[in-house]
Amino acid sequence: MASPTISSMEQYTPSSKDEKIVPLHGDAAGSDTEKGESREVFQENVDGVEFRTVSWQRATVVFLKINFAMSILAIPGALGALGSVGGSLCIVGYTSLNVYTALVLGDFKHNHTECHTLADMMGLIWGRWGRELVGVQIIVAQVLISAGGIVTSAIGLNALSDHGTCTVMFALVSAILITLFSSIRTFARLGWLTWFGFITFVLGVFIFVVAVTQVDRPAAAPKTGDFELGWAPIAYPSFVVGMINATNIFISTCGSSMFLPVISEMKRPHDYRKACLVAGFIVGAMYLSFSLVIYRWCGTWISTPAFGSAGPLIKKVAYGVSLPGLILGVGIYQHVAAKYAFVRILRDSEHLQANTFTHWGTWLGINLALGTAAFIVAEAVPILNYLLGLAGSLCFAPFSLVFPALLWMYDFKSYKTGTLGQKIKYGLHILIMILGFYMIVAGTYSVAVLIKEAFNTGAIAKVFDCADNSGFVQ
């Protein structure tokens, strides 16, 4: 069957309108590599900054750090709301689905190499306005995730210092450190720091997981007397509680939209699939095993973030070991948003890869603006679960479900009227898109209800609050 035709888009498509592509994520394989390389955002062997230096192994570590992050501190609580069976099914199901849609995005990127981000891809379908709207959505998503990282880092600094100063100051220090890391220009130079961040974060989580099996009772449980652990294979939460916890599990592995800028900096973009599959398997296995152990020993008495569940000493040890990894991981999220805005502003200009004042001023200015925005959001909604829920429903549900399904249907539009098997594939992608729309509406509604409730009950007392947010400090 004939391959779909690339839509002409004046800003990005220098090739003729009748040039054919061969989608990889389907029945055919292969591509015009030479033409694809010529349309890549970053070129090799340039007089300036060399961006195309990332190996597939280093890309794997970046993908691991993007996905294995502060969500592990929220997922055990999600199992408390959904039960071990319901939570496990969500982890396995969402991880598998997110890995699949990540492959869809990678194949689309390979077929349309001029696309640097998801905004560029959606611009092929929706035009200039679509590209700009999705671009804004990318920035909003990363600001929400960065804000969640600032909140969690401030909790860690509070725990380590026994609330040594105003929480706002800890949040400010966290925002500065995250912004400094995100300002490193290339993913290759982020590489060794990313390795360090991933190892320290996993080590901190592992220390906590082992420690939580050795305590008599979770720190949040009653100090004396009998208590009900609350562990259950199947739980029956309210719609709002169930939805936000399912969304928090979903967001844990839906960082595929942030993989795309990394592809543009890989030595061999074709190795993306290998890196994506390896990272997806490792992350899914760690989330499932760690979360089930934590839930088994803490039940419904899980602190948020989860490190507080093992008591004040272990919480300090876990935060002390993992805090560098947490800050470095959130810095990658902010780096992706900054790289999008940077390329958007300087694309096709001499300043994109040249060490000019305009190059540096634009890059550092964008990072400063994003860090400031994330700090303000963190102080306005200082609860990790709600920030993750907002990001998951408003941004990552479209990024990981709706948009990949639309892009697949764009490249395989002929499947709509093809053979029975092709029609079934087309229909399955429509179902993925419908699931995404459901998560947008239901997830946003659930988070809004809980945030309103938090303000009404005093869980969020005020913005820019100096009070200790770490809990159980003794």
UniProtKB/Swiss-Prot annotation:
Signal peptide: none annotated. Residues 1-15 have a biased composition (Polar residues). It comes from the Eukaryota. It holds the Pfam family Aa_trans. Keywords: Membrane, Transmembrane, Transmembrane helix, Transport. Its main location: membrane. This is Transmembrane transporter FVEG_12640. It comes from Gibberella moniliformis (strain M3125 / FGSC 7600) (Maize ear and stalk rot fungus).
